[in-house]
Amino acid sequence: EIPLRLVGSEMCIRDRVKNVKIGPSPAWMRERIRNAGMRPINNVVDITNYVMLEYGQPMHAFDFSCVNNGEIHVRLAREGESVQTLDGTDRRLSSSMLCICDTDKPVGVAGVMGGANSEIEGDTAMVLFESANFNGTSIRRTANALGMRTDASSRYEKGLDVENTYKAVERACELVELLGCGEVVEGIIDVVPRAISTVSLKLEPEKINALLGTDISRDTMEDILVRLGFTMEGDIIHVPSWRGDVEHYSDIAEEVARFYGYNEIPTCFAGGNTTSGGFTPLQQCERQIGQTCRSLGMDEIITYSFISPGYYDKIRMPADSPLRDSLRILNPPVSYT
């Protein structure tokens, strides 16, 4: 049994871990990874990348011998901490960045890239698999601040299915055993620092039909939703974990409309009464003055707007820019001088 401890934070929803030994990477997996536009590294890293391509769930593998005291902490970085990532670059972390650490140091930037100090190498004998679900906003801000957008961060920032973490790590361990490249150690450590919220909505056919302008029956709506993976419990619709975009009854209406068929929704002209436009007393006065002046032989012209030279400074235009050589008037308004 391996003494492993995870310390969760508000930004980390779930971590699932299993440990394997390293073996050679099969040729077919390397070829499939290349076809997906990625570079094969070694057997363990290839498995994590392969699972990410299959499930859309990023994973990471640590050299367990490099994890001090066998403990993994998921926490915010301390001001001034730094870590060398797998690309060989030293990254200076701020207190708003989530990181993966052991008892002494960061071993990776959570959701972005692992650290070189726990990299899988040829002499690695024990591996720690991590499958996590991090807050997408936090990961996006960290990736932007560090100037590194990775395959993992681009997936996290869009939001992932919380329930997929377990499936991904199980698939990774299945590949380890299936390919005979290691021995899976029993035990999964699952940390859920806060309850996973689920979305439930009330099915209101009248409201949906009023929004869509249709007359779809309740049974048809329920059939569409069930086929899309929603579960029904009376009037309550339970939204599946992978549908993070469904939060309001209008989202349910959209799902119903898409699968009922937009072509089945009747078209009609826009309703309502039209009224003739009018002018305000000031507009009527201006039009009357203009008409009188034109009848007296005057010409009406529309010129370019006058602006103060100070606007160039507001938009930070260089002092030697040729665009500053505009036409100057001899009697500018007082506010422009």
Describe the role of every protein-language-model region.
Residues 22, 49, 57-59, 79-81, ...:
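Short, glycine-/Ser/Thr-/acidic-enriched flexible segments
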Residues 40-47, 176-191, 233-234, 267, ...:
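Flexible, glycine/charged-enriched surface loops at secondary-structure junctions
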Residues 16-23, 38, 86-89, 103, ...:
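Hydrophobic alpha-helical scaffolding
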Residues 201-336:
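Extended, well-folded interaction surfaces typified by the phenylalanyl-tRNA synthetase beta subunit core
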